[in-house]
A protein has these predicted regions:
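Feature captures outer-membrane beta-barrel proteins of Gram-negative bacteria and organelles
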Residues: 19, 35-38, 57-58, 74-75, ...
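Alpha-helical repeat scaffolds
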Residues: 1-2, 27-41, 63-76, 101-110, ...
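Generic helix N-cap/helix-start motif at coil->alpha-helix transitions
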Residues: 5-17, 25-32, 42-52, 63-67, ...
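C-terminal soluble interaction/assembly domains
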Residues: 153-237
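Flexible, glycine-rich surface segments
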Residues: 93, 105, 109-112, 117-118, ...
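Alpha-solenoid repeat junctions
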Residues: 55-59, 110, 131, 235
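Residue at a conserved register position within TPR or TPR-like alpha-solenoid repeats
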Residues: 22, 55-56, 92-93, 165, ...
């Protein structure tokens, strides 16, 4: 529909003008809100990129701790990661006890030709070998890990194992374990667990469950900001 398309472009142009004026007068909150409308209404990755970058730079955002989650969000909204970002994301996933996630990232990076060349070639290959070996060990000890997690006094191990399972593609099983872990309580970071529950529900194709999980994320260290951006993405046309 040509008329609808023209109206759509006019609305985007109006929002861009508003964003420009807000940026000029240093109205950071207003600019961020307008960026969110642009990203949500158009789905354009340029807007999403700027929105995520601005969100991460907010005061109090735990960027170092949440960097892996920021990378995940960037991928979900369709932003293509650069070679150094893929390497960093894989390194952080491996450090977080998610070698299967790291291996998948590295395998894709090597396949696309982004990784394994230049000055980082040796480091990329070493990380890939390490992640591949650790992922194989995880798969071999899965039953024992789950039994130990079920017996634990708190839900931390269940949440971690749920994320690990999801990173192998077993999203339904991962979702069940994270849900059990949250119910068991005693979590080190309950909001992070809730954020990860939403992510795994989204991976499993359960949008309503993902929305409920993201809506429950609280706190002021950045997890709730990421959850709100996931909600914006889910509700985008």
């Amino acid at each position: 529909n040509l008329t609808a398309g023209t109206e759509y472009q006019a609305a985007e142009a109006t929002l861009r003008l508003l964003a420009a004026s807000q940026n000029q007068v240093k109205d950071s909150a207003g600019y961020l809100a307008t960026l969110a409308r642009l990203a949500g209404n158009t789905g354009k990755t340029d807007y999403w990129d700027e929105l995520i970058n601005r969100t991460v730079r907010k005061d109090g955002f735990a960027d170092e701790r949440l960097r892996l989650d920021v990378y995940r969000l960037r991928q979900v909204v369709g932003i293509t990661l650069e070679a150094d970002e893929i390497g960093d994301m894989a390194y952080r996933a491996n450090q977080a006890g998610l070698p299967a996630e790291a291996q998948a990232l590295l395998d894709d990076g090597f396949k696309s030709g982004l990784l394994g060349k230049g000055t980082n070639a040796a480091a990329d290959q070493k990380l890939r070998e390490s992640a591949t070996k650790a992922a194989a060990q995880d798969r071999a000890t899965l039953a024992d890990s789950e039994a130990a997690a079920q017996k634990a006094a708190n839900g931390n191990a269940l949440v971690g194992l749920g994320m690990a399972l999801s990173s192998t593609g077993a999203h339904e099983r991962g979702l069940a374990l994270i849900t059990q872990g949250i119910a068991k309580a005693g979590l080190r970071r309950a909001d992070d667990a809730q954020l990860h529950l939403g992510l795994v529900a989204l991976r499993a194709g359960k949008a309503d469950q993902a929305k409920a999980a993201f809506a429950a994320v609280q706190g002021a260290d950045g997890a709730a900001d990421l959850a709100r951006l996931y909600l914006l993405h889910i509700d985008s046309p």
